[in-house]
UniProtKB/Swiss-Prot annotation:
The gene is mntA. Disulfide bonds: none annotated. This is Manganese-binding lipoprotein MntA. It is found in: Cell membrane. SUPFAM superfamilies: Helical backbone' metal receptor.
């Protein structure tokens, strides 16, 4: 009797754990596809566009949390153990990755960024992981993912190839739209000031300078010296606006705004898509939201 009760308790704990952590964004209707896990919501959306209904997609880091220093929960380890493949951004984004995969059963880990011309960090060793903020880089992600899925699941190849082609067309249209929108901002005002200096890929692609209080969210954040430096830059450039991210403590940029006398023009999505109802639930929609926010704030 004690053995039965103990087993029941374990089952209940497992069911509770399954309800936390990894987020399921879709399911395979025919059960013949792959069980895909990825690290964060932006990649989750990209993968859903390619996998369609052929394969299920789950992401680890919940929307609203930043992926650099995420702490995996028990259900994340189980999700990765159960997966056919685990797609990650790479470039040092998932600092918790080794800890996760070392404590799960064997799973193929695939970085989606091997064809990216990665930018080196400016203040420390390593690479800037935020390559997805340049749409052309996400198009490279799509090609890597498509080819890997076709190899893993040949029976679904036609679906993956067709979905990838349609999504690449959508991304190309987004790329052209961004370039058109940017032209409305005076060149001397094309500087993005934000907490984490994550928009360097965006800046190089679309003609912006970028300034951050700190370089990466996992580094030392928001020291008085860092804030003072950014305030001086905002004043010197006579910028009309600064910005905050949805996944970062806003108090630091509030201090910059107060000390410089420059308004915070709005929130942008950097490390995650938006929650349902935000209008930024997909990668494409979040990029459109960000560009609209930059244009509105910097065109004053």
């Amino acid at each position: 009797m004690k053995k039965v009760c103990f087993s029941f308790v374990i089952m209940v704990i497992a069911l509770i754990a399954a309800g936390c952590g990894a987020e399921d964004t879709g399911t395979s209707e025919d059960g013949e596809g792959l069980k895909i896990v990825t690290s964060f919501s932006i990649l989750g959306d990209v993968l859903e566009n390619i996998a369609g209904e052929r394969s299920s997609v789950t992401y680890i880091v919940p929307i609203g949390e930043e992926p650099h220093e995420y702490e995996p929960v028990p259900s994340d380890f189980q999700a990765v153990s159960d997966a056919d493949v685990f797609y990650v951004n790479g470039l040092g984004l998932e600092e918790w990755l080794q800890r996760l995969v070392e404590n799960t059963s064997d799973v193929d880990v695939v970085e989606v960024s091997p064809t990216i011309d990665a930018l080196p960090l400016e203040e420390s060793d390593g690479l800037d992981p935020h390559a997805w903020l340049d749409v052309k880089n996400v198009m490279k992600y799509v090609e890597v993912i498509r080819d890997d899925l076709v190899e893993r699941d040949p029976d679904g190849a036609e679906i993956y190839v067709a979905n990838a082609e349609a999504y690449l067309q959508d991304l190309q249209e987004l790329e052209e739209w961004i370039h058109d929108q940017v032209t409305t901002i005076p060149e001397e005002q094309r500087t993005i000031v934000i907490s984490e200096n994550a928009y360097r890929y965006f800046g190089e692609a679309y003609g912006f300078d970028t300034v951050g209080i700190w370089e990466l969210n996992s580094h030392e954040e928001g020291t008085p010296g860092q804030i003072s430096r950014v305030v001086d830059i905002v004043k010197e450039l006579d910028l009309p606006a600064v910005f905050v991210e949805t996944t970062v403590n806003k108090s630091f940029m509030t201090t910059v705004s107060n000390d410089s006398g420059v308004d915070i023009a709005g929130e942008v999505y950097t490390d995650a898509v938006g929650l349902e109802g935000s209008g930024a639930e997909t990668y494409i929609d979040m990029m459109k939201h960000n560009v609209d926010t930059f244009v509105s704030g910097l065109s004053q």
